[in-house]
């Protein structure tokens, strides 16, 4: 949610052993939010840079009843022309691999975003993953991994597909149109 709209507020919760490193994670969070920002800043300078960019940054204490082990939750609020958007993402490192474990209300994701990844959100209904797979296959693209959690409250699904090669913007747009996607984007990390 929010796309490339200006970020106004970021709240982070550090769980487990990451709590003791939270101030040292401020600079990598800044770099992830604002790729053009100065790299390698000390914690206080990173917080100042966030303020200079008009971003309120808050490191929250976790609620003791949350069993998220060593993970980080980022809640990002964006605003443009008095319209507000909110995105929440939780990440964890599993077997040495950084994974997104939750995106907004899509729990149990555990997606490795390294390489080429497609993210498509749509109204949940049968056959959508087959349509996506068929379109990729027709273009010689193989699926390396897939996660497709549903949000039963909104009746939406999020499909995160890791492919063996980049997917063109044209193909992604074609797939998004065919499945009537609410949102669709690709990452190359």
Task: Enumerate the language-model features and the residues they cover.
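A conserved regulatory-domain signal marking ACT and ACT-like small-molecule sensing domains
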Residues: 1-189
């Amino acid at each position: 949610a929010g796309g490339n709209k200006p970020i106004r507020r970021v709240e982070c919760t550090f769980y487990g052993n990451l709590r003791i490193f939270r101030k040292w994670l401020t600079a990598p969070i800044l770099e992830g939010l604002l790729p053009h920002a100065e790299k390698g800043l000390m914690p206080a300078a990173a917080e100042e840079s966030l303020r200079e960019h008009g971003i309120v940054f808050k490191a929250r204490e976790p609620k003791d009843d949350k069993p998220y082990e060593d993970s980080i939750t980022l809640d990002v609020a964006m605003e443009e022309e008095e319209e507000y958007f909110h995105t929440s993402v939780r990440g964890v490192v599993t077997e040495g691999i950084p994974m997104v474990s939750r995106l907004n209300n899509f729990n149990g994701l555990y997606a490795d975003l390294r390489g080429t990844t497609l993210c498509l959100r749509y109204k949940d209904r049968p056959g959508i993953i087959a349509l996506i797979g068929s379109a990729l296959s027709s273009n010689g693209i193989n699926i390396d991994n897939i996660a497709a959690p549903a949000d039963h409250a909104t009746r939406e699904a999020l499909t995160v597909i890791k492919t063996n090669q980049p997917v063109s913007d044209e193909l992604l747009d074609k797939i998004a149109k065919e499945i009537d996607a609410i949102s669709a984007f690709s990452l190359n990390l």
